[in-house]
């Protein structure tokens, strides 16, 4: 039996309205009763996730910022990874041919250059929000990641520009079809989960994980049991064709699968 369960949030554990369903919360509690370690592995900020855990009284480890930070149950920082200052400077100061909005993250929060109220819909559950700044005056030290949000085709063209400018000095990935992230080299949820399992004296074979986007690829591909959401990005399913696909996040599919796993571990599972 798995000893640790790692969950992506958006498109996986969260429903399309960006809330955690009651069935999901009940199932997470059942996992804790079985002494299975919970880990939330997300692109969201540690400040937001710590607020959510506190509101729900959930004991869980946190992998946040797509692997840039790992925190213990008590909130102790176990691992950090930042963009090199010269990489952050290039991304912030370069004139990119894109309509996408730019978002910068550090330990103090989420920063952007103008109001984009539509983006806050994804944060109704926690109330977390951006701070408006002049991005050219952003301190370059300790930037965890930089994101671009916009149309997928536009972001795909931007990805080419970024790679041509940065080469191997950063890791580029789509955390959603409308979000392209610039991360430190070697930084991803899978690498962060490796750090956490070593801290806990576990192996990746002891873990199960659930996800829906390309920022989940390394995590899903490295654990003993990886599961892809039915609403996942097609690119993820193509990258990991050997992994089972469960149901849609709107139906709380993670809870559906785990309830079966807890109650009928020896019977085959169907997402229907």
UniProtKB/Swiss-Prot annotation:
The active site is at residue 8. Transmembrane segments: none annotated. GO terms for molecular function: 4-amino-5-hydroxymethyl-2-methylpyrimidine diphosphatase activity; magnesium ion binding; phosphatase activity. InterPro entries: Cof (IPR000150), HAD-like_sf (IPR036412), HAD-SF_hydro_IIB (IPR006379), HAD_sf (IPR023214), HMP-PP_phosphatase (IPR023938). It comes from the Bacteria. Its EC number is 3.6.1.-. The keyword Iron does not apply. It is an enzyme of class 3 (hydrolase). The keyword Metal-binding applies. Keywords: Hydrolase, Magnesium, Metal-binding. Mg(2+) binds at residues 8, 10, 212. It catalyses: 4-amino-2-methyl-5-(diphosphooxymethyl)pyrimidine + H2O = 4-amino-2-methyl-5-(phosphooxymethyl)pyrimidine + phosphate + H(+). Its cofactor is Mg(2+). Catalyzes the hydrolysis of 4-amino-2-methyl-5-hydroxymethylpyrimidine pyrophosphate (HMP-PP) to 4-amino-2-methyl-5-hydroxymethylpyrimidine phosphate (HMP-P). Belongs to the HAD-like hydrolase superfamily. Cof family. This is HMP-PP phosphatase. It comes from Escherichia coli O1:K1 / APEC. The gene is cof.
């Amino acid at each position: 039996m798995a000893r640790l369960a790692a969950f992506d949030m958006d498109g996986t554990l969260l429903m399309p309205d960006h809330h955690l369903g009651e069935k999901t919360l009940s199932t997470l509690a059942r996992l804790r009763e079985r002494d299975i370690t919970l880990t939330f592995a997300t692109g969201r900020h540690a400040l937001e996730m710590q607020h959510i855990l506190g509101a729900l009284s959930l004991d869980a480890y946190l992998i946040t910022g797509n692997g840039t930070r790992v925190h213990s149950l008590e909130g102790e920082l176990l691992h950090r990874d930042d963009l090199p200052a010269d990489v952050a400077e290039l991304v912030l100061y370069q004139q990119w041919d894109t309509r996408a909005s730019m978002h910068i993250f550090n330990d103090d929060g989420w920063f952007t250059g103008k109001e984009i109220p539509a983006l806050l819909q994804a944060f109704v559950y926690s109330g977390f929000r951006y701070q408006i700044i002049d991005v050219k005056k952003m301190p370059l030290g300790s930037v965890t990641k930089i994101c671009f949000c916009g149309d997928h085709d536009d972001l795909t063209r931007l990805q080419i520009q970024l790679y041509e400018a940065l080469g191997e000095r950063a890791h580029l990935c789509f955390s959603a079809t409308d979000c392209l992230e610039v991360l430190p080299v070697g930084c991803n949820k899978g690498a962060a989960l490796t750090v956490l399992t070593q801290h806990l004296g576990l192996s990746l074979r002891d873990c199960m994980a659930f996800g829906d986007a390309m920022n989940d690829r390394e995590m899903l591909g490295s654990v003993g049991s990886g599961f892809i959401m039915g609403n996942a990005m097609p690119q993820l399913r193509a990258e990991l064709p050997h992994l089972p696909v469960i149901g849609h996040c709107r139906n709380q599919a993670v809870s559906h699968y785990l309830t079966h796993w807890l109650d009928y571990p020896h019977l085959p599972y169907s997402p229907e």
